[in-house]
């Protein structure tokens, strides 16, 4: 987790970017990614619904580092943390969680589950509202949050700030080579079936209700999607030019 000094440095960086008007030009939206984890994270990125994938789909973000990128207005996509990665000079390797085919730059490939996912559909000049959330529908592998920089109109924070791995049921655990819990699968990913995945006869909000596992995820991370139809308390709406995505966000004291 972050040290007090690191949090101060991050705050100064964000204020400087905001004051100087960096990013968000030409109608684009700036995404600032901050790694407050005590180890490296390799963010994975994927444009959805035909939208481009920025940064060729992935990059390395060391402990305490920040990166800023711009996506166009109307962009739709997802961001997720990859952890426990090792890549050679050609960008080939693997990650313990969130892997996208054994490459550094995912280039249009989605991440393997379990992974905590930030999802967003950004507005345009014709429809300015942005929608975003943090989802555990694909499971959990790291705490993540997304919030507008400097606030905004009707903005909230999407987050799963707790370490779900600590209390992951054994049936959902994914362990690394050292035997440590590296991720927590969703019930859909672990057990399958229409009831857990909200598919087939359960493919509607009225038919697909939260399971005991969804209730557990929601109790730990009340501001994140715990299952497919968890919109009421998980989907955020905002109109801002810059957003901060934080891996391992600081916990309230």
From Swiss-Prot:
Matches recorded under InterPro entries: Osmotin/thaumatin-like_sf, Thaumatin, Thaumatin_CS
Gene3D superfamilies named in the record: Thaumatin (2.60.110.10)
Annotated GO biological process: defense response
Name used for this protein in its record: Thaumatin-like protein
UniProt-listed Pfam families: Thaumatin
SMART domains referenced in this protein's UniProt entry, alphabetically: THN
Disulfide bonds: 37-248, 85-95, 100-106, 155-238, 160-221, 168-184, 188-197, 198-208
Organism placement in taxonomy: Eukaryota, Viridiplantae, Streptophyta, Embryophyta, Tracheophyta
Similarity comment: family membership: Belongs to the thaumatin family.
Organism (species): Oryza sativa subsp. japonica (Rice)
Keywords assigned: Disulfide bond, Signal
Signal sequence interval, chain numbering: 1-19
